[in-house]
Design a protein with these regions (language model features):
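Residues within the helices of the helix-turn-helix
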Residues: 21, 32, 63
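Short, charged recognition helix plus adjacent turn
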Residues: 2-3, 7, 75-91
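Alpha-helical residues within the helix-turn-helix
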Residues: 25, 36, 67
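Short, basic-rich loop-to-helix N-cap that marks the start of a DNA-contacting helix
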Residues: 52-67
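Conserved hydrophobic/aromatic packing and binding residues within compact polymer-binding modules
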Residues: 20, 34-35, 45-48, 76
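Short coil turns linking two alpha-helices in DNA-binding domains
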Residues: 30, 41-44, 58, 72
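A short, Lys/Arg-rich alpha-helix, primarily the initiator
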Residues: 2-26
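Recognition helix of helix-turn-helix/homeodomain-like DNA-binding domains
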Residues: 39-55
Length: 91
């Protein structure tokens, strides 16, 4: 079932997808490995990260992805450029 994305949230969701993709790559993870660590499907990760796409997803999924990336969910939401302390902070 596809969810309609509020126009006001579209840019935020796109930016969130970019942040997830950027940090995933920085961590050296494939979409498949991130999906496995987060307990979600690879196709969901792919749709969240898809350039120019605004994929709506649950807060539970956001928390699972942020845990898998060893970062606070708030840092993903607020990210446009990650400070060095976030990139280097691995559990």
């Amino acid at each position: 079932m596809s969810k309609n994305v509020d126009f006001n949230n579209r840019d935020r969701l796109i930016q969130l997808g970019i942040a997830i993709s950027t940090l995933r790559k920085t961590r050296g993870l494939s979409q498949e490995k991130l999906a496995e660590k987060a307990g979600v499907s690879r196709s969901l990760i792919s749709s969240i990260e898809a350039p120019g796409m605004a994929k709506s997803f649950s807060v539970d999924v956001l928390f699972s992805i942020s845990d898998a990336l060893d970062v606070d969910a708030a840092d993903l939401i607020n990210a446009s450029v990650f400070p060095d302390k976030i990139i280097k902070n691995k559990k």
